[in-house]
């Protein structure tokens, strides 16, 4: 599965619109739409914010694993 499929699927699973996610990422909707279509590379800061928002690991977002659970949070971080 491609990365852009993951971000679209997560958004749809959480019943969010592209406009809502674009606002969360502080970007124009058209820019976010290009990320979801795979027409533009998404910056790492946006990937990290999406992982936090959806509470999934970065590995899941980029397709390295199918395990949707996030990494445990450590108090020393």
Language model segments and positions:
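Recognition helix of helix-turn-helix/homeodomain-like DNA-binding domains
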Residues: 26-41
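Alpha-helical DNA-recognition elements
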Residues: 38, 49, 67
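Conserved hydrophobic/aromatic packing and binding residues within compact polymer-binding modules
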Residues: 7, 21-22, 32-35, 61
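Short basic helix-loop element that most often maps to the first helix and adjoining turn
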Residues: 5-24, 49, 75-76
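Short, charged recognition helix plus adjacent turn
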Residues: 62-77
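DNA major-groove recognition helix of helix-turn-helix/homeodomain DNA-binding modules
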Residues: 45-60
